[in-house]
Amino acid sequence: MKLRLGIPKGSLQEATIALFLRAGLTVHTSTRSYTATTDDAEVECMLIRAQEMARYVSKGVLDAGITGMDWVVESGLEVEAVSSLNYSKQSRGNVRWVLAVPEDSPYQRAEDLAGKVIATELVNVTSRYFAARGVPVKIEFSWGATEIKPPTLADAIVEVTETGSSLRANRLRIIDEVMPSSTQLIANVSAMQDDFKRKKVENLALMLEGAIAAQGRVGLMLNVRKGDLANALAVLPALNSPTISPLNDGEWVAVNTIIEETAAWTIIPRLKAANATGIVEYPLNKVVL
């Protein structure tokens, strides 16, 4: 038996494969194939567009897949959300679908767009957004390059953004947030009733979450006399309580902890000033909480 897993093809593909590698699973792809292999003989992968992932997972064509919550909501299909994975194509953060208009337009809020044309890939969510506000608009599906459509081809757009740089580059101004979205590991409801598949999905979630948690963090080891331990611990903003282990010399202990990588620059000199020795900073692959 194998777990059939969907990998998002397109903008999320590179970031997803890199995340899998950090989690310990290498995904081998080919430019001429929509299938992929992994180092785990019990997992077979298909490259599927994120927009279609929920469809194939809900049908059982795939047991699980990675996609955005936006596309799950847009599809309206029943799948099980297993894990929220805090990464996107450019960063460790989530994304937003926003309502944007030309910088020099008079529109300041959604209600100002009554009777206007809205271009978007997220048609169903956008329809519900305007319907909830009682604003009649004409929503047109956009096949991409949505940012270039106002003002000639559309009066406004609903588009996804991470940093807002693409919108600014196209002289667009955000007037509202339609919905936030995050990357999700989703699964077929029936597949999660199968012991083998459920365990594979849960283990996959555990390892991916661990790889994400390790990003931007480093491990720190040091030795310190018991008499200086309190001062050394006061320097450490630990993820949890630091691990303290006795050394052969009963007057000394070893301290092991996790810190933000950017904090190491200031913390290590302060530890040295607190009489810590043998300070070692090391990279992390996974942090399983």
From Swiss-Prot:
Pfam families: HisG, HisG_C. It catalyses: 1-(5-phospho-beta-D-ribosyl)-ATP + diphosphate = 5-phospho-alpha-D-ribose 1-diphosphate + ATP. CDD domains: PBP2_HisGL3. Keywords: Amino-acid biosynthesis, ATP-binding, Cytoplasm, Glycosyltransferase, Histidine biosynthesis, Magnesium, Metal-binding, Nucleotide-binding, Transferase. Belongs to the ATP phosphoribosyltransferase family. Long subfamily. Signal peptide: none annotated. The keyword NAD does not apply. It is found in: Cytoplasm. Its main location: cytoplasm. The keyword Lipoprotein does not apply. PANTHER family: ATP PHOSPHORIBOSYLTRANSFERASE (PTHR21403:SF10), ATP PHOSPHORIBOSYLTRANSFERASE ATP-PRTASE (PTHR21403). Its EC number is 2.4.2.17. It comes from the Bacteria. One of its GO terms (biological process) is L-histidine biosynthetic process. GO terms for molecular function: ATP binding; ATP phosphoribosyltransferase activity; magnesium ion binding. One of its GO terms (cellular component) is cytoplasm. InterPro entries: ATP-PRT_HisG_long, ATP_PRibTrfase_cat, ATP_PRibTrfase_HisG, HisG_C, N-reg_PII-like_a/b, N-reg_PII/ATP_PRibTrfase_C. This is ATP phosphoribosyltransferase. Catalyzes the condensation of ATP and 5-phosphoribose 1-diphosphate to form N'-(5'-phosphoribosyl)-ATP (PR-ATP). Has a crucial role in the pathway because the rate of histidine biosynthesis seems to be controlled primarily by regulation of HisG enzymatic activity. The gene is hisG. The lineage of its organism: Bacteria, Pseudomonadati, Acidobacteriota, Terriglobia, Terriglobales. It is an enzyme of class 2 (transferase).
